[in-house]
């Protein structure tokens, strides 16, 4: 595959995001809907796919102590700046939160069960009329904007039922046409200057980690760091990763670099690699190449599991990606990288997702531990053999199988998780 296609996909799949991307997506949708209509808000209706609803259900809103779909939608309409994309709530103020709390009776959330992929629709009614926005397939991919039933903007084909994917999704799906040896060849041979931009994710996610080490969230990252000696890059990796996620899910007003639409994915896919780089004094080029490998494997799996799913994509998909990157940084090559992925597939695939919340750092820690274990096993030629569980004869089928466990495998599980969450909130 042409290197430029791969680089273009990597660029498209990584972007800054403030807070967990599902509430950010809801806020962006309502911000855009309000932007086109203006006036005094009478009511807001949000229609979201089950996965997006679940992930935003108990997740903190950046810069506030508030959580959930309703507050995300209200704050998006009240103070959101749609031009900032997934950072649309960057300018939030205390008075905006106070105003939103008085308007909770004006918000209605509806779950759209019969839909494929990510979906969020905002209908904002004011004294000026109705503003409507639809986001599809990617968290910031606005495909329709209406003002009083007049279409102001519409992406071609994105609302056609015969076309299930936006152009961005089609481009990313090309990754699944690659064999693992082609992926590794790209990582080894692409000019460093062409992938140096990947290091932007390190700068951003490291700042978030430093914020988390103040003890935000459940304080897991800070706890792990307290028992980490100077040369232990594994515990250091866990501490960096968990502290960043602690900060993110608790509403810290510091952005993460997302990948495949998730800040937690972006954190897990990068910070363990930074830990190795720092402790082993490796150069930035090696780090960038390992991030490229981590991202590509993550994207590959997510193309089969879906952007949002019943399993914890952060630990499973991003965890498998970073396991390959870890193996690469520790001297592994194609055979060892392949065996690392087999080991990961046989370990934590199937870990459930209960939405973005304070427990995310626990799952992330499990994912990072499994990633290091899988890589170390592979480097010692210890591997789960083909035809054992979901490990297939080809590594490409094995990565596909990881995704298949989530979709269609765990669709009923996802429904039951959501039912439990809704029942528990009453």
UniProtKB/Swiss-Prot annotation:
InterPro entries on file: Ser_deHydtase-like_asu (IPR005130), UPF0597 (IPR021144)
Alphabetized GO MF terms: L-cysteine desulfhydrase activity
Classification via Pfam families: SDH_alpha (PF03313)
Superkingdom, taxonomy of origin: Bacteria
Example GO BP: L-cysteine catabolic process to pyruvate
Family note: Belongs to the UPF0597 family.
Protein name: UPF0597 protein CLI_1810
């Amino acid at each position: 595959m042409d290197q430029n296609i791969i680089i273009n996909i990597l660029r498209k799949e990584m972007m800054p995001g403030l807070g967990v991307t599902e509430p950010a997506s809801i806020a962006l949708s309502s911000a855009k809907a309000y932007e086109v209509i203006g006036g005094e808000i009478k009511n807001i209706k949000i229609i979201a796919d089950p996965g997006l609803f679940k992930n935003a259900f108990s997740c903190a809103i950046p810069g506030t102590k508030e959580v959930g779909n309703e507050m995300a939608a209200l704050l998006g309409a009240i103070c959101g700046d749609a031009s900032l994309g997934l950072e649309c709530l960057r300018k939030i103020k205390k008075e905006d939160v106070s105003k939103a709390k008085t308007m909770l009776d004006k918000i209605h959330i509806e779950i759209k069960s019969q839909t494929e992929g990510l979906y969020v629709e905002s209908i904002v009614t004011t004294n000026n009329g109705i503003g409507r926005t639809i986001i599809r397939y990617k968290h910031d991919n606005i495909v329709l904007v209406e003002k009083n039933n007049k279409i102001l903007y519409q992406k071609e084909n994105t609302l056609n039922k015969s076309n299930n994917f936006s152009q961005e999704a089609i481009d990313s799906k090309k990754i699944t046409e690659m064999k693992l040896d082609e992926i590794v060849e790209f990582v080894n041979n692409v000019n460093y200057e062409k992938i140096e931009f990947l290091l932007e994710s390190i700068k951003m996610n490291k700042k978030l980690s430093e914020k988390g080490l103040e003890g935000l969230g459940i304080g897991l990252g800070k706890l792990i760091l307290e028992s980490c000696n100077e040369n232990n890059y594994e515990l250091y990796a866990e501490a960096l990763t968990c502290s960043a996620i602690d900060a993110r899910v608790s509403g810290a007003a510091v952005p993460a670099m997302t990948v495949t639409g998730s800040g937690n994915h972006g954190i897990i896919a990068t910070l363990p690699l930074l830990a190795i780089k720092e402790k082993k004094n490796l150069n930035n080029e090696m780090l960038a190449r390992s991030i490229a490998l981590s991202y590509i494997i993550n994207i590959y799996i997510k193309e089969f599991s879906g952007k949002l799913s019943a399993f914890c994509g952060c630990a499973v998909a991003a965890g498998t990606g970073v396991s390959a990157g870890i193996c690469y940084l520790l001297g592994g090559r194609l055979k060892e990288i392949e065996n690392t992925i087999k080991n990961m597939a046989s370990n934590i695939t199937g870990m459930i997702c209960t939405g973005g919340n304070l427990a995310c750092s626990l799952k992330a820690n499990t994912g990072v531990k499994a990633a290091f274990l899988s890589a170390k096993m592979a480097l010692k030629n210890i591997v789960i053999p083909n035809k054992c569980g979901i490990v297939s004869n080809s590594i490409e089928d094995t990565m596909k199988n990881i995704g298949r466990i989530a979709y269609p495998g765990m669709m009923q599980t996802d429904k039951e998780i959501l039912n439990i969450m809704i029942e528990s909130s009453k």
